């Protein structure tokens, strides 16, 4: 099996069997809702941060397989990380999908499956929508601490 096929399988697995799907809609969760008007993707991400640690990330949305699977991968990857680590992972993900080289791709875990999105510029917004939600949520939570 080649690498592209493996990446496709990761994407489809997270699309069909999403992790951390469903919102809590209660404190201490912080919700951010963003949309991609160019394609109709609609994403909600909740984050629970306690003492600088990402305790939980929940996600729910409507969209294409790239958008929804990316949300699943992102939520699974960031749980248990410090906010600082999570913010670095988000920035590394953005860099990767834009085609920039990374020092340590392994930190992205299964998110590396979206590396090929750089070849599909119209899909970059799909892949990054949930990541933009969690980035905004972390920034808003930090502002309130």
Regions found by a protein language model. Name each.
Residues 1-145:
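Domain-level signature for proteins that mediate thiol-based redox and metal-cofactor handling
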């Amino acid at each position: 099996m080649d690498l592209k096929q493996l990446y496709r399988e990761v994407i489809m697995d997270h699309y069909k069997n999403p992790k951390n799907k469903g919102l809590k809609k209660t404190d201490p969760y912080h919700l951010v809702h963003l949309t991609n008007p160019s394609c109709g993707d609609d994403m909600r991400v909740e984050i629970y941060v306690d003492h600088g640690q990402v305790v939980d990330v929940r996600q729910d949305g409507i969209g294409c397989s790239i958008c929804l699977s990316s949300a699943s991968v992102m939520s699974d990857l960031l749980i248990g990380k410090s906010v600082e680590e999570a913010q670095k992972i988000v920035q590394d993900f953005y860099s990767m999908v834009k085609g920039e080289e990374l020092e340590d791709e392994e930190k992205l875990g299964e998110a590396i499956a979206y590396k090929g999105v750089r070849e599909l510029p119209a899909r970059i917004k799909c892949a990054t929508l949930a990541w933009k939600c969690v980035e905004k949520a972390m920034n808003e939570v930090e502002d309130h601490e």
